[in-house]
Curated annotation (Swiss-Prot):
Similarity comment: Belongs to the caveolin family.
Name of this chain's protein: Caveolin-3
Membrane topology per record: Peripheral membrane protein
S-S pairs: none
Keyword line: Cell membrane, Golgi apparatus, Isopeptide bond, Membrane, Ubl conjugation
Main function: May act as a scaffolding protein within caveolar membranes. Interacts directly with G-protein alpha subunits and can functionally regulate their activity. May also regulate voltage-gated potassium channels. Plays a role in the sarcolemma repair mechanism of both skeletal muscle and cardiomyocytes that permits rapid resealing of membranes disrupted by mechanical stress. Mediates the recruitment of CAVIN2 and CAVIN3 proteins to the caveolae.
Stored PROSITE patterns: CAVEOLIN
Post-translational modification: Sumoylation with SUMO3 by PIAS4 may reduce agonist-induced internalization and desensitization of adrenergic receptor ABRD2.
Domain of life the protein comes from: Eukaryota
Position(s), cross-link Glycyl lysine isopeptide (Lys-Gly) (interchain with G-Cter in SUMO3): 38
Amino acid sequence: MMAEEHTDLEAQIVKDIHFKEIDLVNRDPKNINEDIVKVDFEDVIAEPVGTYSFDGVWKVSYTTFTVSKYWCYRLLSTLLGVPLALLWGFLFACISFCHIWAVVPCIKSYLIEIQCISHIYSLCIRTFCNPLFAALGQVCSNIKVMLRKEV
């Protein structure tokens, strides 16, 4: 009985990961498009002082821009949204797969192999460079500099 409840709970957790509720009101909860895609009429078209068009033209232009942008986006998202979501899902799945099964193991392998080399390198530095720089430090420690200001 207890094992069945545990299995049901695991199945529920897996189901929740793949079928979570999405927010239809706030569709950018992490604000990834805050400054990039938000383009309004005033961001694109502006008339400097002294070169104004007729008020009616300005109002119709504003309405035309806003409505055409709105409906063009809706049309494009209707036609291309699902295929592009499929494409991006596939692409990020491939990237995740490569990262999990190729990149991380290569990095771990490299770190294991480089550890042996780093010990040898450290030994060489301590054996050859440390005495050399210590001797140079002793030689240069007796150098005295006097500054004299001549008037």
